[in-house]
From Swiss-Prot:
The protein's name in its UniProt record: DNA-directed RNA polymerase subunit beta'
Family statement: Belongs to the RNA polymerase beta' chain family.
Swiss-Prot/TrEMBL GO biological process terms: DNA-templated transcription
PANTHER family xref list: DNA-DIRECTED RNA POLYMERASE, DNA-DIRECTED RNA POLYMERASE SUBUNIT BETA
Region named Disordered: 1395-1414
Organism this protein belongs to: Herminiimonas arsenicoxydans
Self-association and partners: The RNAP catalytic core consists of 2 alpha, 1 beta, 1 beta' and 1 omega subunit. When a sigma factor is associated with the core the holoenzyme is formed, which can initiate transcription.
Gene: rpoC
Binding site for Mg(2+): D460, D462, D464
Stated role: DNA-dependent RNA polymerase catalyzes the transcription of DNA into RNA using the four ribonucleoside triphosphates as substrates.
Binding residues for Zn(2+) 1: C70, C72, C85, C88
Reactions catalysed, as given in the entry: RNA(n) + a ribonucleoside 5'-triphosphate = RNA(n+1) + diphosphate
Length: 1414
């Protein structure tokens, strides 16, 4: 019976576990795993193909080759199970034990494990406090190390060369011991007293003052503490026994022709065994030291290359000079165990085929080829055949299916009914890349896909392939149906917009049907209802675009009862719109259709339908829109011809004018009036404008056509030109493309992104000549190369994002925090870029939202704001709302639903178990391929748009200046701005900010603070081409270091003959004058230097490189006068990183080069004494303490003497460093910075992503904290730990009434954050596998399997979605069972105790009668 049970035991699933621990194995442990020692390097006998005894494939050690059969064939079959054959020594059991039984090799000399030696920082070095170089010299037999100095003056761990050793040996004899090789290191490791060393280090840390020492000690202490905690002995890093991998995991397979294919590991093991055996022999023979030493070194190298080939020295190579693949390479990298086999597996019950369009399908269906379905659903068909008694065995059923018996098809229909399949299109960039559909059997071999889901899959029908997967279990089918069915996923999870938006011909059909034409056939007819309209249309009495009047039935929703009430209304509309009104879902008014439907409108329509009528109605509506769109597009019969491309008549004149202007510029250039750079910029500008003008003229001509009204008068209407309609509706093409067809192609770019100044004046209709064609191919190639690189880069960004966020899951409903972020509308340059409603939609209010007019609470805190609510908030003019955000969520090891808000892909509150981290990563990564790769050169053509020279108000209101705005009034009474960050605000009657405008330094203000103005009033003007340097004081100019030929050069204007001084670049000047900087001081009437008000510092105004000095030495100047101008052209064109690299830079939290400087404290600014190349800036804080900053002189300082700055304000111009923002302004400001910057990049490409996704990533970048003061908690100062863990530890400490640890936030880039997670499995599968595993093993780390990745790797259900509930139930059950067990044990204990008590009582109470009787 027991044997029978044993048989079943092997099938049963292993026990549940909650964590995985990694550590170092002791030699005893390795021997206990082993089933015997491998003594010979032989593998198998090449004649008999049987494994050699004691060899690498030995059956005695590793188990039999055939199931239940020993090697010599004495015992066969099940009845001998467990017998060990006395002839060949093989146990009779299953052959698959060869996958799990390990062997071992007893090493003749101890060997260091290369990971702990060479993986930086070297763990051996840290424990022994020796340098890696020294340890290596000892291990590879180049030097001796003293292990026991005895009574001699030598030190432990002292290194000496052979000659030194010989000399010392002569001197001291046997009083000291020194070793070479791993033995020496092992002795040193054994001698370490970890507890004592750790204590000493703690003391040193307290006493030490030097930063470097503290850092060093802390590192070593961390390693020692890890050993203390994990109970791992340091000398286990030196191996005495080498484990041997089970043979099936390093197979040897015979190929035809008598050759063998083998795993590289066998070669590596063979070398180790050979060298080991040779060393044993040499030691038995008592060979000379030098020979055994060499053999030991070779053994060490053999073991090294088995563990990690190529880590040290040259890699061992096989017969074909290819480096052998070691154990380390098996697990790391894309082809390693983690990423190849554990995170991504190949799946059974799957197939792939080309996709074709299936317009007749419903949204939740897909067409599955019969043959594919037959193969995929085989097991289900076999089952059915057996149940129906058509086949007795699986074999018979298989036969029936293979000959495709007619009954099989009926059964297939039956099996497929209501059994969803999953379709996937690679690359799967977001969760909509896999969706479930109900299969419909079709003839042919291609999968049919519903046209509306193409947008989500990013699929088209030019030969794309898709994979089909079959969910097998009932649970899997249920999840596929409820969560993944295409009709349940009609919104994009990235922004909450519909993903099933019609495109191309559907849009064209709907657009054509809803356009109106003047004086079309049957105009002005009246119809009682839509059916009559359809009759008239079918009888060709009216056209689609005819304007008619008709009674239309609508079903508005009654607010009180929630019922749909039938109403009939007369509408003036067109035939097409009336016909479309038939498919409008109940609850939507006809007015939404009563307009020309462009793509954006249709998207809005579907969104509206989803919000008002629910999911089911919307899906039906979308399907009907699709049908109508296709049908109407076919009826319309729109086609394009060459004559549709109307070339504007003005084109010739525009080009001629431009050519004239270019000639003029060329002449000015040849006569030296303009520089080469200016000429190029101006030419490019002229042609750019010419191209735009031609395009505009062409569009104006295309847009309208002449028609005759019914009364005979002439008028114009929107054109029915086919090309124009396609572009206008959003079906295909854009204005820019039409411009190339019928306008002019315009300027082309070179591969380096610079613009070729010769434009292509022709368009495609006229045709290009050879030169023009060549120019246009020149830049096109760059585009193709970019696209290929972009895809890889974008994929890598997505991978890093997923890795950093994969363990973030919604695990509770409410964390109870009242924190949040204040949201305002995003305004830039007076334009609202993102309205408040869009920013707070789908978020939860953190505070009560109050009606500003009545002060009544409008929405209580904790309300999820939906469309109607945000509209109400906007209507009331509330301009700031505090909402909950993932950043301030207090949930540990996860997020709460209220801080996250609406699940955008479902349109309702997020559910517990939703993997919001992965969704955020996908939402940001998925559009990555649409972003550009190039870094823009600002300057020249790209900056054309930026040349604004004034700013005007867009709305009526009151002018207000921000606190940072400063200006002086010059002699002419003009107000000149002298602050670098001043802004003008316009507020309405209630004092709410309506718009804000930045005003540059040197601008002239036209309005005053508090002025009431009308829209369109100019607020300020400035010269767009130069940047002035302005004086704020009156006095006489005194030049310093302004010397012609050394710091400045004189430029003479050839036309006017006037000369100006230009400051030259220090790099171009001689070495003597490099550090001198031309500047101006001002003198007063008495000839003394003018001082800065309230200080002793003289006013010094420095000139930057390229500045044109406009004043003369000794000239009298007044406040606000211009001393010099810097032409903006000569401002060095700085590269602005855009696109994908910018997003990656932000998420990696890289500090930009030449970063701007932020004020460390709030206080008053003063300039201190200047040093050679730097200027000194002092900020005196409120308590009177001074803080000094040294700033290189070429930087632009944004503050001036006496200005009060706030902590975190920019004081030196340059890009902000996210680390500074976090340190000085806190988490919310940092998040706002990263969110805004990332959104800028995506917005430029027209991609919408919800802010909360970026916030989720920022939360993960901030999940580590640095311990500032450990208090009584179990941490070292300066250690980085997981925030949640530290808070848990603090709770524990506080509960005991002790002092908790204090910490500061740390911002890590996404790669760094992924690698520093608490889960070593997740980190190892991401990057730097060796380093992660080495560190984890020494620390004896425990992986609690919290994240998704770890669970996928160990093959469990992930703790997200339905898996979260499963794991929770399991844990509850376990704790409940444990309680029950303890209760049971206690009751048994009590019973036993009672029993013993009773026995004891019996014994004591019986009188000694029996003794008497004896």
């Amino acid at each position: 019976m027991k044997a029978l049970l044993d048989l079943f035991k092997q099938v049963q699933q292993n026990e549940q576990f909650d964590a995985i621990k990694i550590g170092l194995a002791s030699p005893e442990k390795i021997r206990s795993w082993s089933y015997g020692e491998v003594k010979k390097p032989e593998t198998i006998n090449y004649r008999t193909f049987k494994p050699e005894r004691d060899g690498l494939f030995c059956a005695k050690i590793f188990g039999p080759i055939k199931d239940y059969e020993c090697l010599c064939g004495k015992y066969k079959r099940l009845k001998h199970r467990g017998v060990i054959c006395e002839k060949c020594g093989v146990e009779v059991t299953l052959a698959k034990v060869r996958r799990e039984r390990m062997g071992h090799i007893e090493l003749a000399s101890p060997t260091a494990h290369i990971w702990f030696l060479k993986s930086l920082p070297s763990r051996l070095g840290m424990v022994l406090d020796m340098t890696l170089r020294d340890i290596e010299r000892v291990l590879y037999f180049e030097a001796y190390v003293v292990t026991d100095p005895g009574m001699t003056p030598l030190k432990r761990c002292q290194i000496m060369s052979e000659d030194d050793y010989a000399a010392k040996y002569e001197e001291f004899g046997d009083d000291f011991t020194a070793f070479m090789g791993a033995e020496g290191i092992r002795e040193l490791l054994r001698a370490i007293d970890i507890d004592r060393d750790a204590e000493m280090l703690r003391q040193e840390l307290k006493d030490s003052k030097s930063e470097a020492k503290i850092k060093k000690y802390a590192k070593r202490l961390k390693v020692l503490e890890a050993f203390q905690r994990s109970g791992i002995k340091p000398d286990w890093m030196i191996m005495e026994v080498l484990p041997v991998l089970p043979p099936e995991l390093r197979p040897l397979v015979p190929l035809d022709g008598g050759r063998f294919a083998t795993s590289d590991l066998n070669d590596l093991y063979r070398r180790v065994i050979n060298r080991n055996n040779r060393l044993k022999r040499l030691m038995e023979l008592r060979a000379p030291e030098i020979i055994t030493r060499n053999e030991k070194r070779m053994l060490q190298e053999a073991v090294d290359s088995l563990l990690d080939n190529g880590r040290r020295g040259k890699a061992m190579t096989g017969a074909n000079k290819r480096p052998l693949k070691s154990l380390a390479e098996m697990i790391k990298g894309k082809g390693g165990r983690f990423r190849q086999n554990l995170l991504g597996k190949r799946v059974d019950y799957s197939g792939r085929s080309v996709i074709v369009v299936g317009p007749q399908l419903k949204l939740h269906q897909c067409g599955l080829p019969k043959l594919m379905a037959l193969e995929l659903f085989k097991p289900f068909i076999f089952n059915k055949l057996e149940l129906m008694g058509l086949a007795t065995t699986i074999k018979a059923a298989k036969k029936l299916v293979e000959i495709q018996e007619p009954v099989v098809w009926d059964i297939l229909e039956d099996v497929i009914r209501e059994h969803p399949v999953m379709l996937n299109r690679a690359p799967t960039l977001h969760r909509l890349g896999i969706q479930a559909f109900e299969p419909v059997l079709i003839e042919g071999k291609a999968i049919q896909l519903h046209p509306l889901v193409c947008a989500a899959f990013n699929a088209d029908f030019d030969g794309d392939q898709m994979a089909v997967h079959v969910p097998l279990s009932i649970e899997a089918q249920m999840e596929a149906r409820t969560l993944m069915l295409a009709s349940n996923n009609i919104l994009f999870p990235s922004n909450g917009e519909p993903s099933i938006v019609p495109s191309q011909d559907i849009v064209l059909g709907l657009y054509y049907a809803t356009r109106e034409a003047i004086n079309a056939k049957g105009e002005g007819m009246m119809f009682p209802d839509v059916s009559e309209v359809i009759r008239a249309y079918d009888n060709k009495e009216v056209e689609l675009a005819t304007r008619i009047t008709v009674r239309i039935t609508e079903y508005p929703k009654n607010v009180e009862t929630g019922e749909f009430e039938k109403t009939v209304t007369r509408y003036e509309t067109t035939v097409g719109r009336a016909i479309l009104s038939e498919i409008l879902p109940k609850g939507l008014p006809f007015s939404v259709l009563n307009r020309a439907l462009k793509k954006k409108e249709i998207s809005r329509l579907i969104n509206l339908s989803f919000r008002k009528c629910g999911l089911r109605a919307t899906v039906v509506f979308a399907d009907q829109l699709l049908q109508s769109g296709f049908r109407l597009a076919t009826r319309a019969g729109i086609s394009i011809c060459v004559d549709d491309m109307l070339v504007p008549s003005q084109k010739v004149d525009i080009i001629a004018t431009a050519e004239g202007e270019v000639k003029q510029i060329e002449q000015q250039y040849s006569s030296g009036l303009v520089t080469a750079g200016e000429r190029y910029n101006k030419v490019v500008d002229i042609w750019g404008k010419a191209g735009d003008d031609v395009g505009k003229a062409m569009m104006d001509q295309l847009k309208v056509e002449d028609v005759t009204k019914r009364d005979g008068t002439k008028t114009t209407q929107e054109s029915f030109n086919a090309i124009y309609m396609m572009a206008d509706s959003g079906a295909r093409g854009s204005a820019a493309q039409i411009r190339q067809l019928a306008g002019m192609r315009g300027l082309m770019a070179k591969p380096d992104g610079s613009i070729i100044e010769t434009p292509i004046t022709a368009n495609f209709r006229e045709g290009l000549n050879v030169l023009q064609y060549f120019i246009s191919t020149h830049g096109a190639r760059k585009g193709l190369a970019d696209t290929a690189l972009k895809t890889a880069n974008s994929g890598y960004l997505t991978r890093r994002l997923v890795d950093v966020t994969q363990d973030l899951v919604v695990i509770e409903d409410d964390c109870g925090t009242s924190n949040g972020a204040s949201m305002k509308a995003l305004v830039e340059g007076g334009e609202v870029i993102e309205a408040l409603r869009d920013r707070i939609l789908g978020r939860v209010a953190a505070n009560d939202i109050v009606n500003p007019e009545t002060q009544a609470t409008l929405y209580a805190a904790g309300t999820l704001l939906d469309e109607d609510m945000v509209e109400e908030i906007e209507r009331l003019g509330i301009d700031e709302v505090k909402v909950r955000t993932p950043l301030t969520c207090d949930t540990r090891f996860g997020l709460c639903a209220l801080c996250y808000g609406r699940d955008l892909g479902r349109g309702s509150m997020v559910n517990a178990g939703e993997a919001v981290g992965v969704i955020a990563a996908q939402s940001i990564g998925e559009p990555g391929t649409q972003l550009t790769m190039r870094t823009f050169h600002i300057g020249g053509a790209a900056s054309r748009a930026a040349v604004a020279s004034s700013v005007e108000a867009k709305s009526n209101g009151t002018v207000r200046f921000t606190a940072t705005m400063r200006y002086v009034t010059n002699g002419k009474g003009g107000q000149i701005v002298i602050s670098r960050s001043g802004e003008v605000l316009i507020t309405d009657d209630l004092g709410r900010e309506r718009e804000r405008h930045k005003v540059p330094y040197g601008a002239t203000l036209i309005v005053k603070d508090g002025l009431v103005i009308k829209a369109g009033t100019a607020l300020a003007t400035w010269d767009p081409l130069t940047r002035p340097i302005i004086t704020e004081y009156t006095g006489t100019v005194k030049f310093e270091n302004v010397e012609e030929g050394s710091t400045v050069a004189r430029q003479i204007d050839e036309v006017t003959g006037l000369s100006t001084l230009v400051v030259i670049d220090a790099k171009r000047r001689g070495s003597v004058t490099k550090t001198v900087r031309p500047q101006v001081k001002l003198l007063n009437e008495q000839g003394e230097e003018v001082k800065i008000a309230g200080t002793e510092h003289a006013v010094t105004i420095g000139f930057q490189v390229g500045a044109l000095i406009t004043v003369k030495d000794g000239q009298q100047v007044t406040v606000g006068e211009v001393l010099a101008r810097i032409p903006t052209e000569s401002q060095k064109t700085r590269d602005i990183t855009g696109g994908l690299p910018r997003v990656a830079e932000l998420f990696e939290a890289r500090s930009p080069k030449d970063a701007g400087m932020l004020a460390e404290v709030t206080g008053t600014v003063a300039f201190g004494k200047e040093t050679k190349g730097k200027q000194r800036l002092e900020i005196t804080d409120m308590d009177g303490n001074k803080h000094e900053f040294l700033i290189t002189k070429d930087k632009q300082v944004l503050v001036h003497d006496g200005q009060v700055v706030n902590k975190g304000e920019m004081i030196v111009d340059g890009p902000a460093d996210p680390q500074d923002i976090l340190r000085l302004l806190g988490i919310e400001a940092l998040a706002r910075y990263i969110v805004d910057e990332v959104q800028d990049v995506y917005r430029l490409q027209g991609v919408k992503i919800n802010d909360k996704h970026i916030e989720v990533i920022v939360r993960q970048m901030l999940r580590r904290v640095q311990v500032v003061d450990a208090g009584d908690a179990n941490y070292i100062v300066g250690e980085q730990v997981e925030r949640s863990e530290l808070l848990d530890e603090n709770d524990r400490v506080i509960a005991q009434g002790k002092i908790p640890a204090t910490y500061e936030n740390v911002l890590l880039g996404i790669t760094k954050a992924s690698l520093s997670t608490d889960s070593f499995i997740s980190a190892a599968s991401f990057q730097e596998t060796t380093r992660v595993l080495t560190e984890a093993a020494i620390m004896g780390k425990r992986d609690g399997l919290r994240g998704l990745k770890e669970n996928v790797i160990v093959g469990r259900l992930i703790p997200a979605g339905t898996g979260l509930a499963f794991h929770r139930a399991r844990k509850e059950k376990e704790s409940w069972e444990a309680e029950e067990r303890t209760a049971l044990l206690q009751s048994e204990k009590a019973a036993r105790a009672a029993e013993a008590e009773a026995q004891f009582a019996d014994i004591s109470s019986t009188p000694d009668s029996d003794t008497d009787a004896s």
